[in-house]
Curated annotation (Swiss-Prot):
Organism: Escherichia coli (strain K12)
Membrane-spanning segments: none
PTM sites of type N6-succinyllysine: 100, 242
Identification of the protein by name: Isocitrate dehydrogenase [NADP]
Activity regulation as described: Inhibition of this enzyme by phosphorylation regulates the branch point between the Krebs cycle and the glyoxylate bypass, which is an alternate route that accumulates carbon for biosynthesis when acetate is the sole carbon source for growth.
Ligand binding (D-threo-isocitrate): 113, 115, 119, 129, 153
Amino acid sequence: MESKVVVPAQGKKITLQNGKLNVPENPIIPYIEGDGIGVDVTPAMLKVVDAAVEKAYKGERKISWMEIYTGEKSTQVYGQDVWLPAETLDLIREYRVAIKGPLTTPVGGGIRSLNVALRQELDLYICLRPVRYYQGTPSPVKHPELTDMVIFRENSEDIYAGIEWKADSADAEKVIKFLREEMGVKKIRFPEHCGIGIKPCSEEGTKRLVRAAIEYAIANDRDSVTLVHKGNIMKFTEGAFKDWGYQLAREEFGGELIDGGPWLKVKNPNTGKEIVIKDVIADAFLQQILLRPAEYDVIACMNLNGDYISDALAAQVGGIGIAPGANIGDECALFEATHGTAPKYAGQDKVNPGSIILSAEMMLRHMGWTEAADLIVKGMEGAINAKTVTYDFERLMDGAKLLKCSEFGDAIIENM
């Protein structure tokens, strides 16, 4: 199939050498506009990023944006049922760093979730979700500023692998028959009309995630890494996640037992400070992030727990509208708006573009362009502090000025 993508005349590819990015002064970065409110938030993000790069580097650096397609727009460009073209996957692999708006879930069979499909096809095994408070953001908790965590959610395993069979299907009956007759399973309460699923959790998948979390804690001078799990109930999956995490910390980072264990301390080779490696049961953790958020820092968890935790934490600091996220693998990274497509607001220039703008800030940091990233944070803090905000914040603030989506982007630029 001929290419449907226009490659910019100016710009060069980001390359990878020995696991490190080589970022040219004028990188080509693919972006997916996204469905629904993607038409509003993505243009605002592009404008903010361009302004930050221009202000930080005075024209010496510039991003050449290249639109690629997934979701509803892809079906218009590639054909009726082409939601995730092979060309899109190839270009993300080739150009190493990309960013996307929100994507709809295709109606009917085939791909269950485009977001999950992108993560799995590209082996983006880390879902990275930093959660911090921006001064002035309306929050339901008394001290949102105490929440400052970075979540490493395992992206490739757990029940998100999508290995499940519908109740009353021949496949479900076959699996249940095998479990009962071959494996001696007696605990399926109602086997006659029962959907069934499988939860994979591997040593390799766990260790590469926990390794990345500890490396992040070292590089960013963080105090602790917490393994969150339900190992008290699921001993051989969630419990194994905890055990393999501790094992990796001992074997690769010289972790030493604290008071007989299981908690460990790891010395940060850059600062000499100790990083505590600890674990907590998932339901207790969801209590603790409300009661004692300051005690937690870098979080490593399996896929489902990570989904719950990152959204719960986002609400604590002011909602999913400004929660950034990234999906990172060894070969490439895809930064994303973490909210849905909100089709009823599409094209109204109304919604908060903060999530994809702060995801772009993460992207710039990933590229090593920290000066431009810092300007976006400064601009976001300034706009929110000045109470110049979109409708989702304006209705919760006293004396705020209501801005459109595009105007909020402009306010971020003005506050840089």
